[in-house]
């Protein structure tokens, strides 16, 4: 019993419930040294870099999407009968902050973070051709090359935003880090 308890730890979650979980064991060789797999996993558990490492919605942890990857996402959006919509924001207005958030009393939860981006034209209601969405992305990028541009999609049945991801990041943006540089 005591040996079994040594490999367990008690974790208290945010809801106050205590849960027992196993402590992962490090694989060692005959000499007692950690294996290469264990060393690789220990490098994966590093401290998150809090500076110049901001994220935007879906896929923010990935490198910027290529045109082909954006095209596949657009096809997926249209295949699900969702309504695509383009939005853009200047670099200084793209992230949530006290300067650019609307505060209506102590708590304002009318939108995700009370920060609105400017809509590019109207939502593309009834759009079934992905090339139309891609041409609007190109037009918006041409009109606002120094702005963040994101594609969001809405489900009319559930009346919610389903997804949102960046399709253009300003060339002068310094807030993105490669995945290898996101940890210390």
Swiss-Prot record:
Keyword list, A-Z: Calvin cycle, Carbon dioxide fixation, Chloroplast, Photorespiration, Photosynthesis, Plastid, Transit peptide
One of the record's GO cellular component terms: chloroplast
Disulfide bonds: none
InterPro entries: RuBisCO_ssu (IPR024681), RuBisCO_ssu_dom (IPR000894), RuBisCO_ssu_sf (IPR036385)
Pfam families: RuBisCO_small
Gene Ontology BP, a term: reductive pentose-phosphate cycle
Cellular localization per UniProt: Plastid, Chloroplast
Residue spans crossing the bilayer: none
Purpose of the protein: RuBisCO catalyzes two reactions: the carboxylation of D-ribulose 1,5-bisphosphate, the primary event in carbon dioxide fixation, as well as the oxidative fragmentation of the pentose substrate. Both reactions occur simultaneously and in competition at the same active site. Although the small subunit is not catalytic it is essential for maximal activity.
Annotated protein name in UniProt: Ribulose bisphosphate carboxylase small subunit, chloroplastic 5
Species: Acetabularia peniculus (Green alga)
């Amino acid at each position: 019993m005591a040996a079994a308890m040594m490999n367990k730890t008690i974790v208290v979650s945010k809801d106050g419930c205590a849960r027992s979980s196993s402590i992962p064991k490090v694989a060692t060789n005959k000499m007692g040294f950690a294996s290469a797999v264990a060393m690789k996993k220990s490098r994966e558990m590093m401290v998150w870099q809090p500076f110049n490492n901001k994220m935007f919605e879906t896929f923010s942890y990935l490198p910027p999407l290529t045109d082909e990857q954006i095209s596949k996402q657009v096809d997926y959006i249209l295949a699900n009968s969702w309504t695509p919509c383009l939005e853009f924001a200047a670099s200084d207005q793209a992230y949530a902050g006290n300067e650019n958030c609307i505060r209506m009393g102590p708590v304002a939860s009318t939108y995700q973070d009370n920060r609105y981006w400017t809509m590019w034209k109207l939502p593309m209601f009834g759009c079934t051709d992905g090339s139309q969405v891609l041409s609007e992305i190109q037009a918006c990028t041409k009109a606002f090359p120094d702005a963040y541009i994101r594609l969001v999609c809405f489900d009319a049945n559930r009346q919610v935003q389903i997804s949102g991801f960046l399709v253009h990041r300003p060339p002068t943006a310094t807030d993105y880090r490669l995945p290898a540089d996101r940890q210390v």
